[in-house]
Amino acid sequence: MPVQAPQWTDFLSCPICTQTFDETIRKPISLGCGHTVCKMCLNKLHRKACPFDQTTINTDIELLPVNSALLQLVGAQIPEQQPITLCSGVEDTKHYEEAKKCVEELALYLKPLSSARGVGLNSTTQSVLSRPMQRKLVTLVHCQLVEEEGRIRAMRAARSLGERTVTELILQHQNPQQLSSNLWAAVRARGCQFLGPAMQEEALKLVLLALEDGSALSRKVLVLFVVQRLEPRFPQASKTSIGHVVQLLYRASCFKVTKRDEDSSLMQLKEEFRTYEALRREHDSQIVQIAMEAGLRIAPDQWSSLLYGDQSHKSHMQSIIDKLQTPASFAQSVQELTIALQRTGDPANLNRLRPHLELLANIDPSPDAPPPTWEQLENGLVAVRTVVHGLVDYIQNHSKKGADQQQPPQHSKYKTYMCRDMKQRGGCPRGASCTFAHSQEELEKFRKMNKRLVPRRPLSASLGQLNEVGLPSAPILSDESAVDLSNRKPPALPNGIASSGSTVTQLIPRGTDPSFDSSLKPVKLDHLSSSAPGSPPDLLESAPKSISALPVNPHPVPPRGPTDLPPMPVTKPIQMVPRGSQLYPAQQADVYYQDPRGSAPAFETAPYQQGMYYTPPPCVSRFVRPPPSAPEPGPPYLDHYSPYLQDRVINSQYGTQPQQYPPMYPAHYDGRRVYPAQSYTREEMFRESPIPIDIPSAAVPSYVPESRERYQQVEGYYPVAPHPAQIRPSYPRDPPYSRLPPPQPHPSLDELHRRRKEIMAQLEERKVISPPPFAPSPTLPPAFHPEEFLDEDLKVAGKYKANDYSQYSPWSCDTIGSYIGTKDAKPKDVVAAGSVEMMNVESKGTREQRLDLQRRAVETSDDDLIPFGDRPTVSRFGAISRTSKTLYQGAGPLQAIAPQGAPTKSINISDYSAYGAHGGWGDSPYSPHANIPPQGHFIEREKMSMAEVASHGKPLLSAEREQLRLELQQLNHQISQQTQLRGLEAVSNRLVLQREVNTLASQPQPPQLPPKWPGMISSEQLSLELHQVEREIGKRTRELSMENQCSVDMKSKLGTSKQAENGQPEPQNKIRTEDLTLTFSDVPNGSALTQENLSLLSNKTSSLNLSEDSEGGGDNNDSQRSGVVSNSAP
């Protein structure tokens, strides 16, 4: 019984006894059939025949020479042998010796393979020659040159080795990255298609399923059958693609075609192809033949990867390649190599190998070819030795293939992620042409290479100007942390905002601690990303220090305390995200991330010590909220805090600070798209609770300050001194506000008055802040303006320019604002004191905040300065600029009669008309993005309703309308409870007010447009806190109020309403009875809150009415039924 032949790699041991050859008793003896057996096993044979193929051994075993080529591979000492004397003569003996020497030299290339035989063949077995070359070389080494059959085999092995050498040289001259694309292009050029390993296999099996029983189907029916079966698993399957697969089988002659007159032909599968193995082999053979026709030389391992997606079909593909080889294919390959050398210039002088290759190509490979002569044998083996030496020399010294693989292509993410197929299956179908890393070493190597790359183009023109004007953008980056720009190609920047995939990911902390909370890392969405399917990228890898194109703040953050205080050591770095960065894909408009900060009360004053100030916290970009359970229309609700980088930053990473402040608007606002509706659980809690409540951290987006670069050069001056509110004195408010009425006692009235005075003093101090000494920001082109302030619907096409330049409103400085207020007040109702002035410190602070808001809002334009009179060009509130004309409303002063005995205070409508324009009480064409800040006593609830109204001109959904109606009902119920506490007189006063409000509500109102201008107030947090203190004061002084004062207050409200009837456009104010408690008593600090409360609180009611009116239903009855709305602080 024949012995099973061993694997070709086990050529150093006897296939019978499996013992390694040696020079003593187990000398390797090669037979004429190509098998090599040790001398001991050969002597034990019962008959002189090969134990594997039973080939007769014609020569005496004792006369067969030892295979010295194998002995040198096992490291044995080659014994001196008696020179073999051939019967044909001495000349033939010389030829034999020369041929034997050639084989021994070629066998040395198998030395790395032999050294690894004990541990198995793995990646550490590095050899200059490829595996096909090694395999053919092993065949040559096993040939017995003494026997005639051995010489025939040696000549065929030499020819095969030479042909493979030509193929290797051609492979060295072709681009492996383009190999697969060229192959499939050649396949498609012939009307065929390969759908991928998995899909192609399924398609072939379905074809076999339809035709294996010998049935004849038309092409159309066959294609439809396959497509219908493939669709559940492969939705991309189409009739066209499957038709191309059938065409591939048709070219392979797998069908027996029956033609029919005036009808489609019927196809029947040939009997020899009615098994999957036979059909697949013919299918693969057709693809290999197409590649050969196209002049492509593809290795068997590459074929296995391309057609099967693994490395287990190399021998299958090799057999197909060998079967398709013809005697003419060798000469054709030599011609192709000549053409390739002409194209490259032949730097290695490979043309010298051409005569040897032609000699090998002329060898007859047929089995019945005559045996070669000794001279032909010598010439053939010398030629193959020269050719193989030339290949090895080219690979070692002139090959560009290895260097090409070291250089990543133009795509910056080349091999920076692990290959998914390699991780999951252990093999990659793309082989060397795969653009993903196949090992951790390769991954780290290319990531390091990419870190040294500089972005190929700046993020925007404005960022280039940062460097042109010499601003210190690069020195801001610390040595310890940098931005990973290498793995991300900077895309084009529409409208100056970095689009999805932007290279900028994080601004660098100034400190030495590049800490980064893991919860701040953006989540990578695989279905939106074009990166590798493997591990997600680390967006915060270190990057070069020379990144000057980052949109960083060129101005250092000023100290956060008074200038006379000693500076505190900064122990926490400032982490910011530049404006232009996109941590999230552009399509990710409906996913919001959770605020990483801990839970904290929303408005509880932090227990800071007086005289201390705190380090700014790291600011992160756009933390979006969890997906809503019940979506609401309109933009998401946003917390309103000052956008100033210097103003409202409280370090949220200190464990000792329980208070967190939500941001004013999304820090990373992308103005090019409309944000989806959100379900505001916290807003519903606001509506249900009449008292301020704390906000859970999950609903509080992280605060992000506004980048200063976004402003024009005219805004070079902004406060460098800290806001007084940052020095937060201790305010002993023990019980924090909660969602339910707190059982703990409230602060005393004296404490509330004292705290109010402190806040008023801090608001007053803001007036004297001097401009900073550093240089102004550079003039940025309009394309880089952050577009939060523009209509989102217009931003996509860039149509907001018309709104910017077509209208003008001189509302950007203190001079013009007061001038307009004075001019408007003169022809209208005159105040009791006869002059328009701000009698209250709080009113001044509010006015300054509003002016600061307007200045910041309109400075997104790049118009020239327009001086007015002899006033300074740039006021302390910034430069005069242009914005929409409709921002100015000539509604006249809104005046209320002050209580008797209280200081007279006038309130100009210009002080509040900005809110009408911004919030939707007038004909403003702009829509705020739900981030209108509070002014004075403007409360968060007010802005929530404004956010609801600001639906960008889109009708509110039914859920929003029901929510608004429910809110009004709840507020009316709370109002009725509050009014019952005041007694019969308060009830009667409320009825009088109700009748008056109903009369006003019956008047026609101007058409409402959605508000579109978001406001920003730097002192907003102080205003909120002041509002809380005043609410407490109102509650404490409610029992002490005088009945006659209540009457006076009611008269003042009626007088205000009458002003609107006397020719003034009614500002749609509805007075909220619950907040009348704030005005029923004298307020400390020499002012009464009656007038402001009437106007401010009534604006909330009008915003609610606008929210319902914007539906188109005009349902105002709910809000007009009582004329009051709850004043719950957010």
Curated annotation (Swiss-Prot):
Location of region: ROQ: 177-326
Keywords (A to Z) from UniProt: Cytoplasm, Metal-binding, Phosphoprotein, Repeat, Repressor, RNA-binding, Transferase, Zinc, Zinc-finger
Zinc finger (C3H1-type): 413-441
Enzyme class per UniProt: transferase
Biased composition (Polar residues): 497-506, 1116-1130
Residues of the signal peptide: none
Effect of residue 233 to A: No effect on CDE RNA-binding
Positions of post-translational Phosphoserine modification: 462, 531, 535, 861, 1107, 1110
Positions with biased composition (Pro residues): 553-567, 732-746
EC number: 2.3.2.27
Phenotypic consequence of gene deletion: Mutant animals are born at Mendelian ratio, but die within 6 hours after birth. They displayed a curly tail and malformations of the caudal spinal column. Lethality can be rescued by changing the genetic background from C57BL/6 to outbred CD1, which allows about 4% of the animals to survive to adulthood. These animals display enlarged spleens with a trend toward increased numbers of eosinophils and monocytic/macrophage populations, dramatic and selective expansion of CD8(+) effector-like T-cells.
Cellular component per GO, a single term: cytoplasmic stress granule
Effect the entry attributes to changing residue 560 to G: No effect on cleavage
Site (Cleavage): 510, 579
Effect of residue 264 to A: Decreases CDE RNA-binding
Pathway per the UniProt entry: Protein modification; protein ubiquitination
Effect ascribed to mutating residue 265 to Y: Decreases CDE and ADE RNA-binding
Protein name stated in the entry: Roquin-1
Gene label: Rc3h1
